[in-house]
Amino acid sequence: MANVTLYKQDGSENGKVELNDAIWAVEPNENVVFDAVVMQRDSLRQGTHAVKNRSAVSGGGRKPWRQKGTGRARQGSIRSPQWRGGGIVFGPTPRSYAYKLPKKVRRLAIKSVLSQKVLDSDLVVVDGLNFDAPKTKAFATVLDGLKVSDKALVVLEDGNEVAAKAARNLPNVKVVPAEGINVLDVVDYKKLILTQSALQKIEEVLA
């Protein structure tokens, strides 16, 4: 089993913590990670685009002039698509872009990005993040002690609302619960900071 340094909240070392090789030592699969990122981004799309077809645009439904005898081309309605202001043919309609990859593929994708963090030495494990009050300055001090200056994804155990509130005003920090860790966030943020409890929860879910 691989292991990484376990840090205290003040940035000092507190021994080592073992990592489950089935999660943290997987050969990263870039193709699967790409598919997972595209899936998540597609699921975030609003899909509210819409245009009016010939039944929705304003205008009369009667023939603009009689069929024969005028010398002009025959027309059935001023709402036809060839008219200025007429309806759009085969235009976009509201739809959901969400879809799901197979569960095994999604699990391989999250394991791949987590393993990549270990390979890049971008994984930081802290024995706990406990604050008396939700103060942004206090959380910034913790990051300074851990020597984290890059964008950071902080994964907390359930119920740690004080730490989550302390970090939410920091521009380069995002906080998610252990159950909410996902491929897109891990890819978007350089550093991955886990509490020891969050690490255990992730390994329970993915093992």
From Swiss-Prot:
One of its GO terms (cellular component) is ribosome. InterPro entries: Ribosomal_uL4, Ribosomal_uL4-like, Ribosomal_uL4_dom_sf. The keyword Membrane does not apply. GO terms for biological process: translation. One of its GO terms (molecular function) is structural constituent of ribosome. The keyword Ribonucleoprotein applies. It comes from the Bacteria. Transmembrane segments: none annotated. Keywords: Ribonucleoprotein, Ribosomal protein, RNA-binding, rRNA-binding. Residues 45-78 are annotated as: Disordered. Coiled coil: none annotated. One of the primary rRNA binding proteins, this protein initially binds near the 5'-end of the 23S rRNA. It is important during the early stages of 50S assembly. It makes multiple contacts with different domains of the 23S rRNA in the assembled 50S subunit and ribosome. Part of the 50S ribosomal subunit. NCBIfam families: rplD_bact. Belongs to the universal ribosomal protein uL4 family. This is Large ribosomal subunit protein uL4.
